[in-house]
């Protein structure tokens, strides 16, 4: 086996953390007008939620390729690492989502039909904990957790990557083929976005870009993203897909923006590759706060939706009142910090559980 590539530079690693945190913030901002916390406005900076998910997908592929090559020598280690990362946040938040929905229904803040999943918890809870909410024609997030939809893509991309990386020969072909058939066309459409992160990681190991060109390229990608939003290309490309989609029985649903996603993906990949060679060493001055903020990204991504939906259901929120809006922001930040302390910041609890479960996994299967 070839020796692993050297670690990423601290400055580039910090840049990726900045992108990760800002992507989560833009998702939160996009939901303020979408959920009705503020009046709908034309400001493009409040409508970057989908583009931020593309950033997450590219980042995910990049980081998984990097950590797998350097740290996870076996499929057993890979599965433990991925399950720990995902379930440390997903499990508590899904349970809180169901509990919050039950509270709203019981106390009369929402009609039972709004949270119909409560009537079949035995079906929907396992479905969401197995990330099956986006398979084929299904498109259902857990109660109060609309952003969870992206995990229905990302987790299966983890599984596909693990099969590709650790299996060999006929077994790999059979397993990958079966997985692709199982997940369905929506996940096929966005797979290139996630896989581009893997490709970007391997490309940057062997290639460099001159710093002046990298700085120019970095600026151009940001300018093109702004132009993309101002021109409304995201909306136009989505309508193009919807108007010309040939499979009436297989609506793309959460993947209906895949053409726009591909364009944004190209900008994100180019931005990352340029940033890697642009030497943003100034970020080292703020390394500590950046790492700290980034450590709450996954929690913020899910918690904000739960908090926002609960707040708007039980509190007479006024869109035009800055005190109400600021209070909602404070509650989101506070709950992210509180819940993050028992999720992302306590991954070792979950890791211990998965290590014990993996101990029952036949050693031969774990090293295939």
Show where each model-derived region lies.
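Membrane-interface alpha helices of multi-pass inner-membrane proteins
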Residues: 176-185, 292, 296
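Alpha-helical transmembrane segments in multi-pass integral membrane proteins
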Residues: 1-15, 25, 29-47, 65-77, ...
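Membrane-interface helix-loop-helix regions
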Residues: 65, 86-155, 159, 171, ...
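Alpha-helical transmembrane segments
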Residues: 18-28, 92, 124, 128, ...
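Residue-level signature of the transmembrane alpha-helical core
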Residues: 21, 58, 91, 95, ...
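Transmembrane alpha-helical segments and their boundary/interface "anchor" motifs
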Residues: 50-53, 57, 68-106, 115-127, ...
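Hydrophobic core segments of transmembrane alpha-helices in multi-pass, intramembrane catalytic enzymes
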Residues: 51-58, 153-157, 189-197, 263-268, ...
């Amino acid at each position: 086996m070839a020796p692993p590539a050297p670690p990423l530079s601290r400055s580039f690693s910090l840049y990726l953390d900045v992108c990760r945190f800002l992507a989560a913030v833009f998702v939160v901002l996009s939901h303020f007008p979408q959920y009705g916390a503020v009046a709908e406005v034309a400001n493009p900076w409040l409508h970057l939620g989908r583009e931020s998910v593309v950033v997450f997908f590219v980042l995910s592929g990049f980081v998984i390729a990097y950590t797998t090559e350097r740290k996870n020598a076996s499929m057993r280690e890979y599965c433990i690492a991925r399950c720990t990362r995902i379930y440390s946040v997903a499990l508590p938040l899904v349970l809180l989502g169901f509990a919050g929905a039950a509270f709203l229904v019981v106390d009369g803040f929402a009609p039972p039909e709004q949270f119909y999943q409560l009537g079949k918890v035995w079906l929907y809870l396992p479905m969401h904990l197995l990330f099956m909410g986006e398979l084929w024609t299904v498109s259902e997030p857990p109660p109060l957790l609309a952003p969870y939809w992206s995990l229905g893509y990302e987790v299966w991309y983890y599984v596909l990557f693990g099969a590709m990386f650790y299996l060999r020969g006929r077994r790999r072909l059979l397993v990958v083929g079966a997985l692709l058939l199982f997940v369905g066309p929506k996940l096929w459409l966005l797979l290139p976005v996630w896989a581009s992160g893997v490709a970007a990681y391997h490309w940057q190991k062997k290639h460099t870009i001159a710093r002046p060109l990298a700085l120019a390229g970095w600026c151009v990608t940001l300018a093109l993203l702004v132009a993309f939003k101002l021109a409304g290309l995201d909306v136009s490309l989505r309508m193009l897909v919807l108007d010309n989609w040939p499979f009436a029985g297989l609506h793309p649903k959460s993947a209906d923006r895949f053409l726009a996603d591909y364009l944004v993906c190209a900008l994100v990949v180019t931005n990352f590759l340029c940033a890697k060679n642009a030497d943003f060493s100034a970020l080292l001055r703020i390394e500590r706060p950046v790492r700290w903020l980034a450590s709450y990204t996954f929690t913020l991504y899910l918690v904000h939706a739960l908090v926002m939906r609960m707040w708007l259901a039980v509190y007479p929120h006024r869109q035009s009142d800055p005190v109400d809006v600021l209070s909602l922001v404070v509650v989101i930040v506070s709950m992210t910090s509180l819940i993050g302390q028992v999720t992302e910041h306590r991954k070792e609890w979950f890791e211990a559980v998965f290590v014990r479960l993996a101990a029952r996994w036949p050693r031969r299967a774990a090293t295939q």
